[in-house]
């Protein structure tokens, strides 16, 4: 056996594997979870319908932590006209590791006229974690998206800095007839100068958006005392937030969502019940 084959087999054998596939379908004016398949410790609770047609789903990872060699895959498919809101009851925690990289891969496919709200808790990378995060959203014509991603490097609430380890994060949003967003962030332990020394980074994306939506968002951001900015890339609104306080950052994201949901989706805010616990 070649060395490369032994290394590949070693990384494949290490850690847990989990895969969750969800398909949302619209019928009779209501979105249903039409199909679900899961392998390993990644699953969902029963759907909630606090506002009628949209389907609210909580994604669960019972172990609570991700360690060396773990491979988690999330595959979400929305059929035409469907509307799903997905969130999580807790943060995704990437623990310290001296072994293979822990990997989280997320794929979201939005067919024509569908709507996705992806509002997860933060991903926390403990000092010494070796992690890869790869998220890709593919939107067909008429699809609508509200999605955020929060990266917490170290545990600032406990005074722990991300002094060791490595993070490789990719985020792609593919729009019809538009370049969309394709970015990559790589941080090795202690290199928080890329973030101006801030341990918390959030990206909030909304599509489709226009200059009037951008103006509403910038008005809210002007009230903040932490670094923030927003820009339009064609019809894609991209918001960046830096912070030292996770609770403050989560509160800011929720405030933005309360502004963007009616502006982009034409719906009043209906917060997931888990946010109140």
From Swiss-Prot:
GO CC terms of this entry: cytoplasm
InterPro entries: UreD
Keywords: Chaperone, Cytoplasm, Nickel insertion
UniProt-recorded Gene Ontology molecular function terms: nickel cation binding
Record's subcellular location: Cytoplasm
Pfam families tied to this protein: UreD (PF01774)
Chief localisation class: cytoplasm
PANTHER family (UniProt xref): UREASE ACCESSORY PROTEIN D
Chain's role: Required for maturation of urease via the functional incorporation of the urease nickel metallocenter.
Assembly description: UreD, UreF and UreG form a complex that acts as a GTP-hydrolysis-dependent molecular chaperone, activating the urease apoprotein by helping to assemble the nickel containing metallocenter of UreC. The UreE protein probably delivers the nickel.
Family: Belongs to the UreD family.
Name recorded for this polypeptide: Urease accessory protein UreD
Organism this protein belongs to: Pseudomonas putida (strain W619)
Gene symbol of the encoding locus: ureD
